[in-house]
């Protein structure tokens, strides 16, 4: 496969990278500036959950905007043209919803009281938000079952298997060391955030290995 990119594809890749970096940095800075006074974001587990939540929400929002406005989406999503977005809208919409729900759930759990800070959400409120997001994730997953073709299903299966191997290696090894007293066991929220980030990393690895991250 010829991986050499022409001028327009190179410009599109640069635009995607720069736009993603700027938007991600701006959203993260704004969030940390406004949430650090209420939530204990010096806790590594909470900070990891916030980072994972922001990443998932931004991914979902970008895909959702692209699905709603195909003309604009064709400029920053990795598609041939707006017509492809229209054709794939049935897959893009539920995928965007899943990402946003997962991100909201992680952020809600991270913003509960901790340390000497009251938290932006009470534990009860965060529990309700997390439960609602989880229920919606189940519904969205069932909704997506009939909308995913065999190729995308194989990508999902492969990335899920890789994420399982990575999480077993990382958290299994960590658990063994914690049992022996060499390290402290990871906080539950850190475990959830770590699993979410590993799934994301596995997904990018799988689609990248298939050449699907190259600008089109």
Tell what function each PLM region has.
Residues 36-40, 175-192:
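Extracellular/periplasmic helix-loop-helix junctions in multi-pass membrane proteins
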Residues 25-33, 165-182:
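Hydrophobic alpha-helical transmembrane segments in multi-pass integral membrane proteins
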Residues 147-165:
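Membrane-helix boundary/juxtamembrane motif in polytopic membrane proteins
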């Amino acid at each position: 496969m010829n991986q050499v990119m022409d001028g327009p594809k190179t410009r599109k890749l640069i635009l995607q990278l720069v736009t993603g970096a700027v938007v991600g940095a701006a959203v993260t800075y704004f969030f940390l500036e406004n949430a650090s006074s209420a939530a204990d974001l010096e806790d590594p587990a909470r900070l990891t959950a916030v980072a994972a939540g922001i990443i998932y929400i931004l991914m979902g929002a970008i895909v959702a905007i692209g699905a709603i406005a195909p003309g604009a989406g064709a400029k920053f999503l990795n598609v041939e043209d707006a017509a492809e977005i229209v054709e794939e809208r049935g897959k893009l919409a539920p995928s965007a919803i899943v990402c946003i729900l997962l991100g909201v759930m992680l952020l809600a759990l991270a913003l509960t009281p901790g340390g000497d800070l009251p938290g932006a959400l009470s534990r009860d409120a965060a529990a309700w938000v997390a439960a609602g997001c989880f229920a919606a994730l189940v519904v969205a997953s069932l909704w997506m079952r009939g909308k995913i073709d065999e190729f995308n299903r194989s990508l999902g299966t492969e990335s899920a298997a890789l994420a399982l191997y990575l999480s077993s290696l990382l958290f299994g090894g960590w658990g063994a060391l914690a049992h022996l007293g060499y390290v402290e066991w990871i906080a539950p929220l850190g475990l959830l955030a770590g699993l979410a980030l590993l799934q994301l990393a596995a997904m990018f690895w799988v689609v990248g290995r298939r050449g699907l991250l190259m600008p089109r």
